[in-house]
Amino acid sequence: MLDKQKFVSKLVTTNDTKIVLLVMDGLGDIPVNGKTPLQAASTPNLDSLAKESDLGQTVPVLPGITPGSGPGHLSLFGYDPIKYQIGRGILEALGIGVEVGEKDVVARANFATWDGNVVLDRRAGRPATEESAKVVQLLSEKIKKIEDVEITFYPGKEHRFVVKFTGEGLGDRVTDADPQKEGHPMVWAEGLDEPSKKTARIANELIRKIAEVLKDNPKINFALIRGFSKYPDLPKFPEIYKLRAGAIATYPMYRGLAKLVGMEIIETGQTVEDEINTLKEKWNDFDFFYVHVKKTDSYGEDGKFDEKVKVIEEVDRVIPEILALKPDVLVITGDHSTPVPLKAHSWHPVPLLIWSRYTRRGLSQAFNEFECARGTLGTIHASDVMTLALAYAGRLEKFGA
């Protein structure tokens, strides 16, 4: 089978063009009362940009397959998400600066609420980051080792934290200790090979110990652990595409993914405006910028239509600031769809906009799911987005005589 990434890499050339990939996490949606959040939002700048752009829609993995954020992003970065399957734990861990060694398995965890059988809230009401950090500190003091495996906790954002398991004979082929839906009984971790069975056993015992330590907390009284992973070996983005690549993201997982593929992590603030200010400050330092906006996904998962609309409008307001930097290529898309009615990731194609001097402009009137479905790019695999970005930037040689 053709390795598209290797094929494209052989055609890559260098020049002084700049590419911006703006990812609005979970952007795609389905109509509520006749409109999607993208349609309902006031987006004069995105709509104006759409008139000068090529539009389409992407499939992150395969038609009908619902992707996680990891596969969705890997695909956007030009990697085959089926070939390179990466646990979410390593992404979250790298994103918050955790050192991961050969004897380590890391996993992403959520604080949760349960009643002793059923998981009532998979995010424990989304506690503030500061509150979660105090709980992580308590766990660090109470739980240090299970059997011969050292346990280390690291706080993340809101309800999220990272667990590192350090010991001999640990595997990462472990199913998630998470029912994935609220109102369902707990689903415990299972190992798919002998080393991973040990990891699963330790993880399940850890969850029981966490529940014991937190039994008097009315909301944060349980944990879900998933995305077990060791450090994977991936080809590096800057080497494949000959780009100085910088990542601007506020959430650890996305910083971790960017770091894993070899991008440089650029420190930034917590808001969209902070991220754009960082883009301006670092504009001369990189050829390629990955800019990530998280809240479109968060509000989709929470079923909050109006809030998702507001985030889209917030992004729309900064589009002129991005264009003022005069990028040669601006790509705006999502890593997957997170429809408000579903309150979850979905299989729906993802809106895609590519702006450059070389687009077939004038064929689209607005940026939304339905205009994108009719767009000039058609429906493409998300792993082809990087190839297109390079082509629009004049960074690919002709193939063949």
Swiss-Prot record:
| InterPro entries, sorted | Alkaline_phosphatase_core_sf, ApgAM_prokaryotes, Metalloenzyme, Pglycerate_mutase_ApgM
One GO MF annotation is: metal ion binding
Q: Carries keyword Iron?
A: no
Please list the GO biological process terms of this entry: glycolytic process
Reactions it catalyzes: (2R)-2-phosphoglycerate = (2R)-3-phosphoglycerate
User: Which pathway features in its UniProt record?
Assistant: Carbohydrate degradation; glycolysis; pyruvate from D-glyceraldehyde 3-phosphate: step 3/5
One matching Pfam family is: PhosphMutase
Which UniProt keywords are present, listed alphabetically? Glycolysis, Isomerase
Q: Name the CDD domains on file.
A: iPGM_like
UniProt-listed Gene3D superfamilies: Alkaline Phosphatase, subunit A
This entry's Enzyme Commission designation comes to: 5.4.2.12
Domain of life, per UniProt, equals Bacteria
PANTHER family named in the record: COFACTOR-INDEPENDENT PHOSPHOGLYCERATE MUTASE, METALLOENZYME DOMAIN-CONTAINING PROTEIN
What this chain does, per the entry, is described as: Catalyzes the interconversion of 2-phosphoglycerate and 3-phosphoglycerate.
Family in the record: Belongs to the BPG-independent phosphoglycerate mutase family. A-PGAM subfamily.
Family matches, as NCBIfam families: apgM (TIGR00306), PRK04135.1 (NF003160)
Q: What is this protein called?
A: Probable 2,3-bisphosphoglycerate-independent phosphoglycerate mutase
Native species of this protein?
A: Thermotoga neapolitana (strain ATCC 49049 / DSM 4359 / NBRC 107923 / NS-E)
Q: Which gene encodes it?
A: apgM
